[in-house]
Amino acid sequence: MLEKTYDAAATEPKIAERWEEAGAFKAGAGAKPGADPFAVVIPPPNVTGSLHMGHALNNTIQDIMVRFERMRGKNVLWQPGIDHAGIATQMVVERQLAERKEPNRHAMGREKFIERIWQWKAESGGMISNQLRRLGASCDWSRERFTMDEGLSRAVLEVFVTLYKQGLIYRDKRLVNWDPKLLTAISDIEVESREIKGHLWHFRYPLENVPFDPENPHTYIIVATTRPETMLGDTGVAVNPKDERYHALVGNDVILPLVGRHIPIVADDYADPEAGSGAVKITPAHDFNDFEVGKRNNLRAINILTPEAAITLKDNVDFLEDLELTAELKALIVELDGMDRFAARKRIVELMDERGYLEKIDDHTHAVPHGDRGGVPIEPYLTDQWYVNAGELAKPAMAAVRDGRTQIVPKNWEKTYFDWMENIQPWCVSRQLWWGHQIPAWYGPDGHCFVEKSEAEAKAAARAHYGEDVALERDTDVLDTWFSSALWPFSTLGWPDKTPELATYYPTSVLVTGFDILFFWVARMMMMGLHFMEEIPFHTVYLHALVRDKHGAKMSKSKGNVIDPLELMDEYGADALRFTLAIMAAQGRDVKLDPARIAGYRNFGTKLWNATRFAQMNGVKLAPDFRPENAKLAVNRWILTELTRATRAVTEGIATYRFNEAAGAAYRFVWNQFCDWYLEFLKPIFMGDDEAAKAEAQATAAYCLDQVYKLLHPFMPFMTEELWSLTASEGKKRDTVLALAEWPELSFEDEDAAADINWLVDLVTGIRSVRAEMNVPAGAIAPVVVLDANKVTVDRFARHDAAIKRLARVERISFEQQAPKGAAQMLLGEATICIPLGSLIDLQAEAARLAKEAGKIAAEMDRIEKKLANEKFVANAREEVVEAERERLVELKEAAQRVATAESRIRDAS
């Protein structure tokens, strides 16, 4: 007999151990002979990471699919692993050194510092893997990989050297996102925009050959900027070619204030005639758009910042070129050189004002890009870096999605994928860090570069080049973390070696990931997979949405609305969290997570536990020779039919990535049909004297529960595994753990039995609804009058008389020609069901109560409708607040409809 309650905290570790002992998650476990492979690679979490709600959703979805396909007998591999997370890991260890008052990395030296990171990884790096196991992730943990382990490092070397020799990796001077605190280039995903209240400064740039007069607008052009310090690097002013105001000036120069550099006025579509003066200052070395304008118009790129974002003028050859070093300019150079960018901004504005070049200052709120780890504003920065020719690699990656070899689900993301791929920029893959894959490039005395897999090979190449042995210096940069991640689908399977795993599991079946890394990871895996394997890395990409708080707001520490999945698992168990995420994971829709929902789905687990316990108390046990088609009782044939339908819906839902529909189908069958109705129908049979009926009911209930455990296992693996082991045939053990049991393939359906019992369910539900709407006391027993019933309906009433009276609290059923006075009515098929209310409730008092309720609802609806009609409210309120009001309005409209129905019934009855 089951314990009275299910203890998730005590059971989950025990079940995890059972799976481990059974080897249930090993590649190929439980596979049928000759089965098709089903392979999934986990999006590797950062080694520094702790499980967050995004991980919980992502890995729940993967685990649902993996457990489902494993039970269907496929040859399953779920490949786990962890990302070395360059910047994040280096920062964690640097912080640890500072906290322990140990020498910093520079004092320690590169080699010792990297040793220290490996030591940290050995001590703390396994935390997220353990948290994923706790969630129930059924990966083949014996195959866990790390992006810096020896095998993957070999794959990275092979790819880098091959691409270099194919001319697809090269060194170039371009703009990058530069973090002046961490002193490295960072990727776009590591940049976050923050709304900052700042200013827009409007400056006067004097025209050449015209005496500058601040009072005469014909002597200057006005440009505006949010970053005045960058004007020191201006090399042009752009105007739109269609802007007639500037036609005569295009090709002439302006003189850069404070500096004296002559810079051309160029015609370029980038300039917007409607924005400000229509003229734009161009600083190619410090703005991504300006860099492109500069390339189109052959403008110089002058970098005026140090890596730390201080001004550099004194020894800056590019800045000083062609400048007349007047006393005024020398003084400016002395004053500004080495000054922090923000102090320089303030001083430059003062100087522009003093010399008549400041037109005006506007308050201006704008998005300022910050490094998400360094936390300071990043700078577009001109520097030498390593690049991948992504444009070339993108072509086959686009073709693979266009011709359907790889499908993106939901399909609407394909447009985003193509938009990005068609406009792809060279991919900057170098980082100025110590932790990561060091770039395999060595430089000779004259700077000649040798890219090889080892230092010995580089020395041999240098010897061949110079005709003698020379000293080589290795590039100190490391590769972007996304570079090694881009190889994940094949590097984890042993490439560049030709392994059996690679032959079996590549290409993988499906990739599950968030839409936010479609470009940073998915597209790059497509490029690398197609280039090196000459085959797509996955057949399907399933992109899930974000997990937000219950109001629809993005979770962030600053908002204080972060929901911790580990805390939720402590309180409700892993199954409740998983089921909640699954049933809310509608395609393309963000998950709005309310912890109250998780409590609700824990109750669902409790319902199943209690149903099993109730069944055991009534002698329900597996009958080995039970066959659905042999059941005789309509109620059993009905539940077996509904079980087949539910199985079909769950199977289709998972197979088509509609996890919410699959979970919903399982939920409705278990809670509504099996627990609320079927077990209720069985009570008189269990208490009766018909032993044959009792035995059939017991066997049917046991069979249904067995299938339910299987259907729910991908969603709620822990509880279902425990129930499976505790409900084996008397005196026997199960042949296998539930994780390796066979997925139900059911075909039994009895349309007549289903129609018959579903009619009974609809009748009782309808009568109960009317009673609830009319506030009929729960204990009151009411008569029922039936009008216009045909023979089938009359027979059904006769056949189910006892059940109707017991379940709907009905004292007698009569068939009449006319509705009695004071009766509420409902339609069921061709018949009208009348419930006389006069003796049960005070119709007048109930009408008054309903009118009052309708008034309250109408008033609140009016208030919300006015709010939503207010354009200022919709424009200025937080998105989640507006959404909450819209949702409340929908709820109120539904409530108003219910009250209107009840009022209509009262009127009819009166």
UniProtKB/Swiss-Prot annotation:
Which catalysed reactions does the entry list for this protein?
Answer: tRNA(Val) + L-valine + ATP = L-valyl-tRNA(Val) + AMP + diphosphate
Asked whether the UniProt record includes Lyase among its keywords, one would answer: no
E.C. designation(s): 6.1.1.9
Q: Where does ATP bind?
A: K557
> One GO molecular function term?
aminoacyl-tRNA deacylase activity
Motif ('HIGH' region) positions are 45-55
Q: Which PANTHER family does this one have?
A: VALINE--TRNA LIGASE, CHLOROPLASTIC_MITOCHONDRIAL 2, VALYL-TRNA SYNTHETASES
Quaternary structure annotation from Swiss-Prot or TrEMBL: Monomer.
Recorded family membership: Belongs to the class-I aminoacyl-tRNA synthetase family. ValS type 1 subfamily.
What is the official name of this protein in its record?
Answer: Valine--tRNA ligase
From which lineage does this chain's organism come?
A: Bacteria, Pseudomonadati, Pseudomonadota, Alphaproteobacteria, Hyphomicrobiales
Gene this protein is translated from: valS
